[in-house]
Regions:
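Bacterial N-terminal signal peptides that target proteins for export
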Residues: 1-8
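Bacterial signal peptide processing site
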Residues: 19-21
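Active-site rim segments in enzyme catalytic domains, especially the processed small/beta chain
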Residues: 88-95, 101-105, 109-112, 262-267, ...
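C-terminal motif of bacterial Sec signal peptides marking the signal peptidase cleavage site
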Residues: 15-17
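Noncatalytic scaffold domains of N-terminal-nucleophile
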Residues: 23-63, 67, 75-245, 250-295, ...
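Extended C-terminal subregions enriched in glycine
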Residues: 470-472, 506, 515-562
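Internal maturation/activation junctions in enzymes
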Residues: 32, 316-428, 437, 582
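Short, small/polar residue-rich loop motifs at catalytic or cofactor-binding pockets
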Residues: 278, 407-410, 475-477
Length: 592
């Protein structure tokens, strides 16, 4: 029924070239992992809509979501269409071969749809050990060893069952049209193809992403994906079971096991038994707002709740932004100092206590206890504490420290529909291009490397985030929905890619909107900053020199880097809804 208007809309978007108008201790190694390469700064002022808004990482994906809402669909319908298009046009970041965390507000409650990948039943705590030692990180990433059972397709189906309005099959039409007729390779995808040293080693990926002479396909060239179109047609007509059983599942398992040097243990049983989970949202209060996010296996909301619990007693509003390098606002040295010290303490606790709560006892209430956070916050002094130690929250078990790297190839979607339903969804295949295994036109994840490579820490204590069969690896994905604490009215949908730096990207944005009176786009535009219990990380080229020097004077070990977040969000304002997208990437928003 919807094929003609949706196909026409996508074709028009393609013809228009996708142009959119915008209205001193040694740190843990994981803190030094840089986000995906930058796309260059593209100035964005935000997009205004009265009735609804869609924000995502690629204009074609945004257009797909926009058309779904125009056709009478819900925010969840739109999010599904957006994610399917992202599988095609932003394959390095997310897709049906990966996992997702989706928050949904239906006007009554916040539900958390957990599509995080799971470890195979044959996985053991020795999965990433070699000769008694943890293997080199990328030796674990590249190949079948790192592939977990993908969860996104099941999660999308569960969300649609509960919140969808349009027929399931219609949600696939924009992605199928683009896969069959072709899409234009974006500058970001082209740049990442040029820089990746592993992807071309996979024959299927090489044939798709590279030319006959081995050079990557250039930005602006058109690419079709008939293999993915066929998969999407199958899922549209047969439903999610077709992904987890039968030929499509068998192809995934065969690909994982066939890697010549690093085969994996994913089985047909692992895929057939995968289930998405419906959880309750996890919320905390800050200033006049109630901030709701994802519970375990995400660590993001717990960490943010701790950070802002420690900052609640500080007069952050008085620490107004200063003038940045390009004359735009930037956080002051004192604001960065207080935030980064709180983040060190939160990350220390995160690394010790947070993992899949279906497998380990996570002391959530203790970690967010106001008295505990007051004691932790009292550790913040005038000078940087350097490397923070984990605390002992109420009901905390004895756990070992985990320094698992978490790589930043992820995407975020924020949508509010005409009825006020809101979605905040972060999805990922983990590293850029995931495991570098391509099957049937899409890439498989490497999410198992989000587990700790070791099961015991140096003191012999068990690591909460160790590999166990069927377990979901800890994530930092932090999709948020923010509400007015008094009225209960939705204020914002917000999130970002960026690996474990997601927590600080989202935290910076909350400071901007909740303490400094910035609108969502202005807060996203602020130079990024934070700490992951290593150095204090600042955005190169945009952080004022005076701020850098002031932080060094306070004892901070400062690292300047690109800090390429990919924040997307929607914020209520006087005119309806403000859509916001990160100038550091290619995202846009569109509403009406």
């Amino acid at each position: 029924m919807l094929r003609k208007p949706l196909g026409l809309a996508i074709a028009l978007a393609l013809l228009a070239g996708c142009a959119a108008q915008q209205s001193p201790q040694t740190p843990p190694a994981h803190t030094l992992i840089a986000p995906e390469a930058a796309s260059g700064w593209q100035e964005k002022q935000g997009w205004q809509g009265h009735d609804f808004m869609v924000a995502a990482a690629n204009p074609l994906a945004v257009e797909a979501g926009y058309q779904m809402i125009q056709a009478g669909g819900s925010a969840v319908d739109a999010a599904i269409a957006v994610q399917l298009v992202l599988t095609l046009v932003e394959p390095q970041s997310s897709g049906i071969g990966g996992g997702s965390l989706m928050l949904v507000w239906d006007g009554k409650q916040v539900a958390a749809v957990d599509g995080r990948e799971t470890a195979p039943t044959a996985a053991t705590d020795q999965l990433f050990m070699k000769d008694g030692k943890p293997m080199a990180f990328y030796d674990g990433v590249v190949g079948g060893r790192s592939v977990g059972a993908p969860g996104t397709v099941r999660a999308l189906a569960l969300a649609h069952q509960r919140y969808g309005k349009l027929p399931w099959a219609s949600l696939f039409e924009p992605a199928i049209t683009l896969a069959e007729q072709g899409f234009v390779i974006s500058p970001r995808l082209a740049a990442l193809l040029t820089k990746d040293p592993y992807l071309a080693k996979d024959p299927d990926a090489r044939a798709y992403f590279y030319q006959a002479d081995g050079s990557p396909r250039a930005a602006g060239s058109r690419l079709t994906n008939p293999a993915l179109a066929k998969v999407l047609r199958t899922l549209a007509s047969e439903g999610p079971d077709a992904f987890y059983r039968g030929p499509l599942a068998e192809a995934m398992v065969a690909k994982v096991h066939a890697h010549p040097t690093n085969p994996g243990v994913l089985s047909a049983v692992d895929l057939a038994s995968y289930r998405a989970k419906l959880r309750d949202g996890l919320c905390f209060d800050y200033r006049q707002s109630r901030v709701c996010g994802f519970p375990s296996p995400s660590s993001g909301t717990i960490a943010l709740g701790q950070i802002f619990g420690m900052l609640e007693s500080r007069d952050m509003a008085a620490l107004k932004p200063v003038q940045g390098e390009q004359g735009q606002p930037a956080a002051s040295a004192e604001a960065i100092h207080l935030y980064s010290e709180a983040a060190r303490l939160a990350f220390a606790d995160r690394n010790q206590y947070v993992a899949d709560s279906d497998y380990v006892a996570v002391p959530v209430s203790g970690l967010l206890d106001k008295h505990y956070l007051a004691r932790r916050g009292a550790l913040i002094g005038e000078r940087s504490m350097g490397l923070a130690n984990a605390g002992t929250p109420p009901l905390a078990p004895a756990r070992g420290q985990d320094a698992t790297p978490e790589l930043p190839s992820t995407s975020h979607i924020s949508i509010v529909d005409k009825a006020g339903m809101a979605v905040s969804m972060t999805s990922s295949i983990e590293d850029g291009f995931g495991s570098r295994l391509m099957v049937n036109g899409y890439l498989l994840n490497n999410q198992l490397t989000d587990f700790s490579f070791t099961s015991l820490d140096a003191a012999g204590l068990p690591v909460a985030n160790r590999v166990e069969p069927g377990k979901r690896p800890r994530s930092s994905m932090s999709p948020l929905l923010v509400f007015d604490k008094s009225s209960g009215e939705l204020e914002m949908s917000l999130g970002s890619p960026g690996g474990s730096a997601i927590i600080n990207y989202v935290g910076k944005t909350l400071l901007g909107t909740q303490d400094w009176g910035l609108n969502l786009q202005q807060a996203i535009n602020l130079p990024n900053f934070g700490s992951r219990n290593g150095p204090t990380e600042l955005e190169a080229g945009r952080t004022p020199t005076a701020v850098v020097e002031a932080l060094k004077a306070k004892g901070h070990e400062v690292v300047l880097s690109e800090q390429t977040s990919g924040l997307q969000g929607v914020q209520r304002n006087a005119g309806g809804w403000l859509g916001a997208a990160d100038p550091r990437r290619e995202g846009i928003a569109k509403g009406k």
